Amino acid sequence: MTKPAKSPDSHLFYQTRNQKPRVSHSQGVYLWDQLGNQYLDASSGAMVSNIGHSHPQVIEAIQKQLNQAAFAYRLHFENDAAEEFARDLSRVMPVGLNRVFFASGGSETVESCLKLARQFAISRGESSRYKVISLSPSYHGCTLGLLGVTQYGPLNDPFDSMYLEMPKIAAPKAYRDQDALSMDQRGERYADLLEKEILKQGPETVLAFLAEPVGGASTGALVAPESYYPKVREICNRYGVLFIADEVLCGSGRTGEYLALTHWGVQADIVALAKGLAAGYSPLGTVVAKEELVEAVLDDGGFMHGYTYAGNPLACAAGKAVLEVMLEENLMERAKEQGAKLRAGLEELQQQFEFIGDVRGKGLLLAFELVANCETWEVLPPAWNAHSRIVELAYEEKLILYSRRTRGGYAGDHLMVCPPLCINDGELEELLSKLKRTLIKFAIEHKLPTKLQSSHPILN
């Protein structure tokens, strides 16, 4: 197999040698490359650009802060941007979640959550608690610490001797279960796995349960049954286990609520936010925790943790402006409305393409799963690399999608369809039209059956 050529003028490296077009500029739901090609961003980057690209209100806020102070080290100065954004953020949180710790991105933020939880246990005289139970499959970040709570084979395998593996339970993929139970019964059965694992590990050793309320890259917008998170919360309370919600991807309004967990009427003890928090205008993440947790840690000597750029004024000015746009333009309600339309469009495609096994998600965090058989959930041949091939074909249509393996990183395929929350009806139609042409090309490549009229222009 021929290796992709490295660009002769590039000193950068990332995961592979693959070279993408160089971006020129962006606006709303579109990006342009340096050749003038216009792309519809149907994945908001990596589910980041929640308010759209190049919003003038955010640009103005960044420029204003840049003229005042771009950086002030947190041990030397407080800054208005961080204080004001923390205040504004606490106002959109559930009651009691009102203490904020800023970081620079998702991995830093989730790791900060785990360390805060650990110090809280120590402050209560429960130093035996250190185990964090998470889901399989799952993704919580790429640091060595977070690989222990992540289960996504290709990311774990090279480093498995370098980190502490934490216990896992099955993710609530109730949509695949073939039994006579109701969805609520399935949800409770999946939640019961948490209690069984706590008892197996020893309740006195279990620190926290960590989960994405709506699944991200590892499960493709997985939505648990209505009964799942209320039962999880009850189990955590019973055994003194903290519930940490990783809302790095699903939070910040993408599902139609500022926190995705709100859909279940449940509150976590600690929340991680990033990605859409500053919507790509600056690297930013934040821990939001219950006041009693933070006060206990501060009373016990302080939070033994920090980052150089924690509370960076430029990043916080961007985040504050993004939240203002989110609220002023009613983008969470728009995520619900446009998400319902997009989901209906994806479900229509599901009727036309037999290899689409499931359409799922909430708001504008949506995905569809590819299968060889909709009844048995048999996956497409892994050698097809269907998820990445569809992304390539979509690029030809000037449509940007996000894809991953569905089953632990080795098999199964899903595509994430998560445009900016500001997308309008005409842009939704364009997205679905480009996606349909992409799927037709994929079906032709692999001789897959469709229910399209044989007169369709791409089929001839």
Give residue ranges: language-model regions.
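Conserved N-terminal phosphate-binding loop of PLP-dependent enzymes in the Aspartate aminotransferase
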Residues: M1-N460
